[in-house]
Amino acid sequence: MAQQQQQQHLQQQQQQHHQQQQLQQLQQQQQLPQYNNNLYNLNYNMEDPERRKRREREKYERQQGIQSDDRETSLFEAPRRLNPSEGDNMITAALGEFVDAKEHMCMNMVGIHRQAPGGGSNARLQGQATTPIINSLSSINSTTTTSSSASLLPGQLPTSQQQQQQQQQQQQHYQQQQRAPTYLKQADNKPPYNGRGGYPGQPMKNDIPSSSGMAPPRGPPRSASSSSSASNNNSSSATNNATAAAATSASTAPLLGPPMSTQMPNGREKSYLGPPAPALSNGGRFVPPAASGKRTSNTAGLQPPPPEKDISKIINEMTNSYRVTPLTSIAATPHAPTRENYNLNGPNKNKYAFDDVEPIGPLNSPPAASGASSSSLSCTTNSSSSLLMTPLLAPIAPITSPIAPLLTTPPQASQLPLPLPLLPPLAGATTVLPPALGMAAVAPIQQLMPTPPKASPTPPTAIRPLKSEKNHSLEKQDSCLENDLELSESDDDRKRDICSAGNSSNSSETDSSESGSEASSKGEAQQQQQQQQQLLHHQHQQQLLLQQQQQQQQQQRATATTANGGNKKKCQTIIASGANTISGLLTSSGLGGSGGAVNATSNTNSGLLGGGGGSGSTGGGGGSSSSGMGNMSSSSSSNKTPSPTDSNRWHLSRFFPKPTNQATAESVSPGNVACGNVSMKVPGILPGGAQIIPESIDVTTAIVKNEKLHDDTRRITDDEDEDEQQQQRYAAGLSVTVKKEQQEQQQQQQQQQQQQQQQQQQQQQQQQLSAEQLALAGALPNNQIKREVRLSDSASISSGSASGSSSSDSAAGEVVPLPGPGETLQIPGVPAAITTVLRVPPAMQQKVPPNSVTLTPIGPLPASPKPRQKKPRKKKMSAATAPPLDSSDEDEPASSNKKHALELAATTAAAAAAIAAAPAATAAALPAVKKGRGRPRKQQQQLQQTQSGNLSSASAGSLAKGPTLTAAKKPLAKSTAAAAAAAALAATALTVAGSRKREHSSNSSSNGNTPTKKLHAAPATVAAAAAAAAAATTLLPPTAAAGSSSDEDSTSSSCSSTKSSNSSSSGSDSEATATTAAAATTAAAAAAATTTTTQNPAKKRIVKINKLGVVSSSKNNRLYGAGSSSNSSSSETEEQQQQQQQHKQQQQLLLMQQQQQQQQQQQQKQQLQQHQQQQPLQPQQQQQQQSHFTPDAKQARQRSSSSDGSSSSSTDSSSTNSSSSSDEVDVHHGGGKRKSDKKKICTLTRIFNPKEGGAKKQGQVVIIDQSEEQLQQQQQQLQQQQQQQQQHQQQQQQQQQQEQQQSKEWKPRATPTQLLGATLASPARTTTPHLTSLMCKIDLSKLARVPPEWYQKSYRQYAAEQQQQQQQHLHTQQLHHPPHHQHQHYQQQHQPHQQKAQQNGHLSSRSAEGARTPKELQQAYGMPNGYVTSGGAAGAAGAASKLLGGVKHEHGVKPEPELDAGYEAKYKPNSVKQEFMPKQEMPTRRRKRSSSSSPYKEKKRKKEKADQVSKELLPVPVLLPANNHERLSRDKLELLQQEISSANGSPTKRSFPLAHAQQQQHQQQQQQQQHQPQHQQQLKATTTTSTTATVAAVQTSTTATQQPTTCSEAVQTTPPPVAPPPPPRLIYRSHFDNEEEPPSDDLRKNEILLQEAIRRKRAADSERDSFKQMTLYLEAIVYFLLTADAMERSNMEATWTMYKDTLTLIKFISSKNRPYQQSTNGKHESHNIVAILSLRCQSLISLKLYKLRRANCRAIIASCSEFFRTGGRGDILNGNTLSSISPSNSVGSQGSGSNTPPGRIVPQDIHNQLCRQNEYLTYVNSAHDLWDQADRLVRTGNHIDFIRKLDHENGPMTLHSTMHEVFRYVQAGLKTLRDSVSYPQSQ
């Protein structure tokens, strides 16, 4: 009844007011225009002029119909960030939309109404109007309806209110029609324009806010669910509802927005029409505009103020209707189908997507059960929004659930109490989500239809967080990188497309929309606090993770087992953890969670969901994501960077072949690298594929410090020491560190001490390991061990896990993240400065001990000594060796205790090995033996003496070390000799790994790198070595035993010159002491030594070197040396030769018995022992022959091997040891193959200091072992013939030589290197076939030819007094031993130099083509006085003159060893003089060679030698000038020669009269005494030569010897002073002389190259001077080319991109230079030359691009040819035939077809192929065209002389030039240009 009464009452009121309404309508119609004008004016005046203009412009556009409803627009056309600060977002989130609040305050509180009071056009106003306008149909009072509607949920509009809305709409329409024409939209039936705002159905500029006077609301348009937007005409999302009812009725209650699926990105709604539209009075032509609720008018006269409301009502309205409702992602996120309308490629590159992620509550709070306010992004959302949100989570959860397992909940997630099933996104991603951002998307909700998760077509991996923004810091901070590589936008667009396919919208965190959404989502301060807490919590977790990571790293480091994998993981957390550091962005989280933590820290700033989550995940795919999450997080991390799957992107990980165990972990998605807040300080990837190369990360010690941030985690305890050790070992083996040499030297000294300490500690630790444990350690995974070896000190670890080091060799194939230039580990996926290719062992850059030479064998070296023969030694080892093992390790002089402990382990292991083939244990012991790179030799010697017993370990160490020497070049060399020793000895199984290691370690032939042989040999060698050592120790007197052990030790040390050349010498010193002691008992000791040598495995090695040296030294040496050499060459030939030599030696012994009965006895014993051992055990024969311990043999070995082996002058014995060790290895290899003397190689390597050994300081030496057997046989024959003749003469000559040597040679003595340099430099250089400027080719077969006379002379020189005391006629044995022992240190200082000089000079004349002796070494070499004086003295005339002649002639003389007589004849003084003197070309050639150290000159020299290729055997160790500046003018050389000759004048003059007879006699006597076939051959030849010839040769040789000591001087001084310099002649070189430098895959090197390129480019960008700018640009180009060349070996696509971008850059540079090229005046000549170089570079780059695509081009040509051959298909006779193809268009097609010419239909694929072919062939065409342009410019600019000079010095640049040659050429040209510009007088 009450209702009926109310209805009646209402009806009465309606009737009563019906008339009033009509009157009011009329009044309103009259008042509206005025009201509108006033209101508009007010609003207009309230606005600032900027908005006024904008609105006017928009109004005009709307009136003109410029913007149509149907036009598809991105969510925001051009996001404008007025204040893109986080503070604005926070304010907006806190305050809500101020527009709505303002409107409410104006209407409800202040009472300002924007409509006439009777208008009732606004629901709010109507609800508040005193006299609401009520439709006849309406049954409810407006006030009650409004109040009730306020409480109603959206969408529940009461029917009365709907009726009222209809009535209002009709009235409004009527009123609008009554309005002034100015506001009437005229022809297009659009609702009248109310002054501002869009028409209800017309979307308006999204950014334009209501006239609130505030900045436009940031973020996406407010969705219909937001209450305030409903009343805003211009809010597209609200007004675009199909009916105005929804818009107007949203007044008091927020409308229920359309379902998420219908929300369109442009604000339009696709399917949801909202509440049904009321019938429109205007026929529905258009929705009447909602009364502009934004206009506030102060004109109270227009309408009565609304009745004042109760404050409680106002507050209720504010809280209910106008509460801050932050934008829900539902309203904001476009629906998945919107991809159709959402133009991802459109101008709006920063698209806005809003992720539906539940707000991150406090970590400890359980997730809200309902997805309502707690799960929704806004905690303040109304019940309506919560209702909306709850259903949304349902589809999201299953969709993201597949991601959850991928996320492998990071430790953060695991720590969260949140259950995964309830909140998979939280568990998987949001935990990592930087809470500050709070909006990271777990899954692209808008992309996913609400279909069940299984139905979702996209795989979970495709799901990517929506927030993938391009970091503006990347874009804007360094725009230079855009230019650095001339990145193409097409790549960016294409990659954005790829990303956009995954992400419906790429939202940038900093974008206004996202910030707005975030702000709204953050809503309350509570959320912000929670987020902050979460951030703190995340950071805390990350710190914990970092700590855990460090602990884990330490643990891993502690255990050598995880050497590879664990260390890699550790290292991969690059340089410093932190938000901005590389670790955050780049770490491919090796330890999933821990790495992720680092990433999370870095990403907290960027707020990438994937950043934390992915990083936490084990995969560690990128800075932001684990590999498992890979695509998802990576796309989230960057907007423009393509998904990591994009092929064109430079995936840094591509350049790192990933070890199998870390294939996934190391993958770093480039997107992640470029994520969020990445600054240019962090390496990353720019959109075009350019990499961000942080300049701050320089290759300096600072990096080492940075690395220690993480590495200290690994190396907390002894890491610092180990780091130094690593640096040392890298320096010794590979010189990995880029640190400057001075610093390195200082560090090395410190490091050596630290190493010794560390080694002691490690050894002590390792001692605990039993042989079994060592073997097990060897069984550890190769990659782990390998990694361990590299990261930690290779030596220390190898000693710790010797087998581990060996296994690391086997893992050499893997590319391990190597310590960066400053020890900084570089993550394989992300090099800090460069995309690098496979790591190539860096050439030794660190300072190597001055005496050490790193042999980088180029080409196959002669088979390394076979380790097999050590098996018999095993037996001996097991019995006798165990007790003495303690002392033998010479490697660690400092830590004898450690050695002993290790050796004890080694002894036990050795016994086990000998018994049970457990050489692994011995190997482990051996690696323990490893010593620091540089150790005082004396200490080592003392240790050796004390520890002489440990032959097995010493030999094993030597074996291992030998390979490391030769392998110095290899990365495994880092593991150092200890690793090699461990590899060889670790286990028979490990021996395979050891062989691998040796193979990797430079395929050092010395170690018998042939893995098969190694397999047999390594265990055999270990056991055999140990057994032989034991036997030797037992058999020999303690002195002899000590000497033998020291020999092996020294050999091992000498071989392992990479670790410590000094150590080798120290070993030799100890040996020397032992030998001196043995010298006392020359005969007995010799006999014992013979017996022991037969038994000593170490002596085998010596024998190998002795092949050459021993044979030359004496009969015994011959027996041993010949046998050993023959063994190396072939077992059969060895036996025969040995037998022959033994017979010869026996004959000689008979002759010698008259003079030396003691010697005869010793020799006979040695012979018998040798025969016995040689016949049954050829492999052991070398060991036996190593009996060089017999004074003669030992001395000879020491001479040959130590002169070769121990670059340090002091170590003869070390060289012998090296020879013995090599012999042992050879024995193991088997007699069938000759193998280069390991010790020789080692010694030679030491001789050539890498500092001076190569232009690149790589000090590479090629040692070639050539027909030693033939030479020996020939020598034997000659010896037999000459022995009888020369016996009598030798005595006299020896006496004379001794006198002369003592008196004369010491004074003038020039270092043998001088001789070598002078005589050998020119021919030898030219001969080096493969090596550019770095190599010295040494023919080991020729090393054997060092005349024993020379040794005798040297010994006589040094110990002439003793010789006289003992017997003047004592021959090689006594002469060698007693003086050798007594004066051994003295001899070591000089004899090795003599030997080296002879071997270097003599050998160099034969074998060493490119060997460079460092200046230090050259100076160090005491020129054996006997050598010089022998030339000068008549008594010494014969052999000495031959040596001199040979050595000097090595210069010009090109002996052919094949011709015995001819070979000798060439060494005849006459021939020498003729070749040397008359060949005036040679000095000029030398001059040209010396003119520049460039490899091209060496190539020229090679070409000159090409004529003399047959004479390749010239083993001249050419001393190449360190640089061009060291070249001496001819006058200076002559002066120097004259001075030296004047100093030596008397002896030389004396030598002339001594004449032929004395020379012959002396030679014969020496030959008889030494019975060395080589010298006999030479002596015979010399005897035949005339006295004048000898004198001339002596003169020339003396002059050569007198030449300056420095390498450059030696090289340059070679021309004889007499002959005038011949006119320079053109030197041509063959294209095949082009020897590419060995490609360096060293990561650090490539990084440095790229850094240098970018640094120069940036410098050029900022340079103002045009010439300097062009030169800098061009330098940058060549560095880019080197980088691309390095990349070419790993990733062709990246290489293509690099070359292409470089070509674009150089074209741009050339365009800048063109204005200067035009003028040919002298002012711009330099510009023309730069242009020439630039054009040539462009030509070569174009040609390179074609070559890279040559295979594709061939395929294209084949397919196209096939197509054209078959005639194709679809020939069109006339255009009308098209009608048949498309009959539907027959009418139009006929008309158009008549105009089309006849043609052929080409398939699309053929067309595409033709296009590509055109591109590729264009490169070829442009290459030749550009080259022709350069040539024309050379001619027209008169630059022919400049280019010709440049060509002569550096080799001509041709289209066949490699990038390294281009680099050298361009750099040389630019340097010349700069010099000419800076010092024009030089021109």
From Swiss-Prot:
> Where does this chain mainly localize?
nucleus
Any one GO molecular-function label of the UniProt entry = DNA binding
- Give the span(s) annotated as Disordered: 1-88, 140-311, 329-381, 449-540, 609-654, 796-827, 844-901, 922-962, 992-1018, 1039-1075, 1115-1145, 1170-1238, 1358-1413, 1450-1510, 1543-1583, 1595-1641, 1783-1803
Q: Provide one Gene Ontology cellular component.
A: nucleus
Per the record, where are the segments of Basic residues compositional bias?
867-877
- One BP annotation, GO: regulation of lipid transport
Q: Where is the composition biased (Acidic residues)?
A: 481-491
Keyword Transcription regulation attributed = yes
Query: Sites of the modification Phosphoserine?
Result: 488, 490, 887-888, 953, 955, 1546
Residue(s) carrying Phosphothreonine = 458, 1548
Which family, according to UniProt? Belongs to the AF4 family.
Q: What is this protein called?
A: AF4/FMR2 family member lilli
What organism does the record attribute this protein to?
A: Drosophila grimshawi
What's the name of its gene?
lilli
